Amino acid sequence: MGIKYQKIGDVVIVKKELSEDEIREIVKRTKCKAILLYTTQITGEFRTPHVKILYGKETETIHKEYGCLFKLDVAKIMWSQGNIEERKRMAFISNENEVVVDMFAGIGYFTIPLAKYSKPKLVYAIEKNPTAYHYLCENIKLNKLNNVIPILADNRDVELKDVADRVIMGYVHKTHKFLDKTFEFLKDRGVIHYHETVAEKIMYERPIERLKFYAEKNGYKLIDYEVRKIKKYAPGVWHVVVDAKFERI
């Protein structure tokens, strides 16, 4: 059977309509409780999927990845399989001396593995979508974490200054527009994990130019960086992350 599908917990996502036979085959093969068709691209600021339920009713599930539990409603919340390596990398990027700010926490995609395995002093996990925030709080409990403070807010309205050794910017729509706030969060020295979607031909230039521009504007200088590819986003366009080190001038 050549049907492409993605399994999140015990819910399956497909990208095209299925026949009754195909539905039966997937249910038999995966033991899933629901099959969802993602009808259009994920849209809007809150990254909400547009879905049609092809089988079952219950779309809330618990997905296990890398020893972490993620509760989510797959009909309401996006789960990106393409970011799995980055979630693993973030798990061990920090240490117990750090304070981390996750500016776009979602349901805890990066916060949960990082808090669990790196054991930083504290993670401020900021999320403005109330549905995602609900699951973020659930996931903090599910994973028995006591070093995460969830904050329901637009990160630009959060009053935290000079607190972060590390800031995660895991969002790819005009991410640079949030950099002024990022430098407010950052201590005198720190690391920013800056995500962006960028045309392949300027992939190693544009993100760095943007980081340098906002650093200078906020009294910092870029001292070291590395650009990493996460996944192909569209033809000729990559989702990249820049690990960038800064210090205050």
Curated annotation (Swiss-Prot):
The UniProt transmembrane annotation reads none
Catalysed reaction, written as an equation: 4-demethylwyosine(37) in tRNA(Phe) + S-adenosyl-L-methionine = 4-demethyl-7-[(3S)-3-amino-3-carboxypropyl]wyosine(37) in tRNA(Phe) + S-methyl-5'-thioadenosine + H(+)
In the record, what terms sit under GO molecular function? transferase activity, transferring alkyl or aryl (other than methyl) groups; tRNA 4-demethylwyosine alpha-amino-alpha-carboxypropyltransferase activity; tRNA methyltransferase activity
Q: Which top EC class applies here?
A: transferase
What is the first-listed, main subcellular location in coarse terms? cytoplasm
* Residues that coordinate or bind S-adenosyl-L-methionine: 80, 87, 127, 154-155
- Do you know which NCBIfam families this protein is assigned to? tRNAwyosineTaw2Meth
PANTHER family membership: TRNA METHYLTRANSFERASE (PTHR23245), TRNA(PHE) (4-DEMETHYLWYOSINE(37)-C(7)) AMINOCARBOXYPROPYLTRANSFERASE (PTHR23245:SF41)
Task: Quote the function comment for this protein.
Answer: S-adenosyl-L-methionine-dependent transferase that acts as a component of the wyosine derivatives biosynthesis pathway. Catalyzes the transfer of the alpha-amino-alpha-carboxypropyl (acp) group from S-adenosyl-L-methionine to 4-demethylwyosine (imG-14), forming 7-aminocarboxypropyl-demethylwyosine (wybutosine-86) at position 37 of tRNA(Phe).
| Stored HAMAP family | TYW2_archaea
Q: What is this protein called?
A: tRNA(Phe) (4-demethylwyosine(37)-C(7)) aminocarboxypropyltransferase
